[in-house]
Amino acid sequence: MILIQDATINNKVQDILIEKNKIKKIGKNLIQKENLNRKDLKIIDGKNKIIIPGLVNTHTHTPMTLFRGVADDLPLMDWLNNYIWKMEANLNEKIVYDATMLGCMEMIKSGTTTFNDMYFYMNGIIKGVQETGIRAYLGYGMIDLFDEEKRENELKETVNTVENIQKLNNPKINPTVSPHAPYTCSMELLQESHNLAKKYNVPLHIHLNETIDEIKTVEEMTNKRPFEYLDSFGFFNGVKVISAHNVHLSNKEIEIIKNKNIAISHNPISNLKLASGIAPIPKLMENTVLITLGTDGCGSNNNLNLFEEIKMASLIHKGNSLNPTVVSASQSFEFATKNGANALGLNAGELVEGALADVVIIDINKPYLIPNENIYSHLVYSFNGVVDMVIIDGEIVLNNGKMVNINEEKVYENAEKSYNKLLNNSDE
């Protein structure tokens, strides 16, 4: 049991009581009101601290931490075909594990408590997630390139991943079904992905409408835009869908997104860095679409700090629309907390009694957070993402900025070694 006293919580100075993996009580003077005379009670001084819900990163590729800075300033297809996919061919489970450890640490240290990931060498990712204590939604990223034999192998990998994760019976690790995109996946793979998501009652996670060229490719193959094509065979029906990017959308596609309750993962920094464009978030908001935030992978961002996405998501749409009132600080903050949790069906993202105890504690005695009067504005527009403490599922995983159960230096050392192996193999 954890009691944090006299912290700023939901704009008030009060206490928060965590029991097991839930927020039990929020209020003043809880130590007296709750008769907290227990040996297992850990009391934390919350003075000069603000407590916020843990951030939810709804689209990333965590092991791509080792791709940070290796292929900058390139268009998407050049970036993928000539750099990323060539390097990925040299990955193995150990490299992916080392990269995942680094990525999970980076997310935790910048206040992310849950992430939604699509990649491969899933055992390495699962191991890293378990050791760091972060909450994760994990999918094997399927690409069949319209080849029947490869399709069967990809689907088999997904079934194995889903069933292996479910067998863990770990509430912090959840499976998804994750076909890469319509331009890399056959209709048969996409249809079977939908069937598997329904069968196992897990979310679908996919990239859609990231670039104009990608949309043209799908139109040439199907005579339809991506959302129209997927909707034509029921891909969105009866399942929870998280769609990443959604940069270039027709009015008809926005109608499909709205009517099918598709959750949008907005990745503004990656979209800007790859010059993919700017997603029409204000228009989607007008249509009551659920907007969430993702970082994408470190190869195209180049970090996993969701506070940077929160700031960018608010600023870019003001500048793009010439309207300073669109995407307010509070709305952008909700994208990364409440909305992200809702998209994944997670009882988190808000500091309310009964919610999962995924919380972040930030020291507000910092020059860039003073004066404290408009602290939530500061968290969006002036905070650097360095947090003091992180609690996930009721367990402290970061204390005073340091990982509790992880040797940080060893993680850095192993990541450097794996990067050198990856780079040397790629050069051969």
Swiss-Prot record:
Pfam families registered for this protein in UniProt: Amidohydro_1
Gene3D superfamilies with a match to the protein in the record: Metal-dependent hydrolases, Urease, subunit C, domain 1
Enzyme Commission number(s): 3.5.4.41, 3.5.4.31, 3.5.4.4, 3.5.4.28
Needed co-factor(s): Zn(2+)
Binding site for substrate: 88, 180, 210, 296
Metabolic or biological pathway, per its Swiss-Prot or TrEMBL entry: Amino-acid biosynthesis; S-adenosyl-L-methionine biosynthesis
UniProt-annotated binding residues for Zn(2+): 59, 61, 207, 296
Top class in the EC scheme: hydrolase
Keyword Coiled coil set for record: no
Reactions that this protein is recorded to catalyse: 5'-deoxyadenosine + H2O + H(+) = 5'-deoxyinosine + NH4(+); S-adenosyl-L-homocysteine + H2O + H(+) = S-inosyl-L-homocysteine + NH4(+); S-methyl-5'-thioadenosine + H2O + H(+) = S-methyl-5'-thioinosine + NH4(+); adenosine + H2O + H(+) = inosine + NH4(+)
Signal peptide start and end residues: none
InterPro entries according to UniProt: Amidohydro-rel, Deaminase_MtaD/DadD, Metal-dep_hydrolase_composite, Metal_Hydrolase, MTA/SAH_deaminase
Keyword terms, alphabetized: Hydrolase, Metal-binding, Zinc
Gene Ontology terms: biological process: S-adenosylmethionine biosynthetic process
Extra information: SAH is a product of SAM methyltransferases and is known to be a feedback inhibitor of these enzymes. As a result of this inhibition, organisms have evolved efficient enzymes to metabolize SAH via different pathways. The pathway found in methanogens differs from the canonical pathway, it uses the deamination of S-adenosyl-L-homocysteine to form S-inosyl-L-homocysteine for the regeneration of SAM from S-adenosyl-L-homocysteine. 5'-deoxyadenosine is a radical SAM enzyme reaction product which strongly inhibits radical SAM enzymes.
Assigned protein family: Belongs to the metallo-dependent hydrolases superfamily. MTA/SAH deaminase family.
Subunit field text: Homotetramer.
Its job: Catalyzes the deamination of three SAM-derived enzymatic products, namely 5'-deoxyadenosine, S-adenosyl-L-homocysteine, and 5'-methylthioadenosine, to produce the inosine analogs. Can also deaminate adenosine. The preferred substrate for this enzyme is 5'-deoxyadenosine, but all these substrates are efficiently deaminated. Likely functions in a S-adenosyl-L-methionine (SAM) recycling pathway from S-adenosyl-L-homocysteine (SAH) produced from SAM-dependent methylation reactions.
The protein's name in its UniProt record: 5'-deoxyadenosine deaminase
Name of the gene this protein is made from: dadD
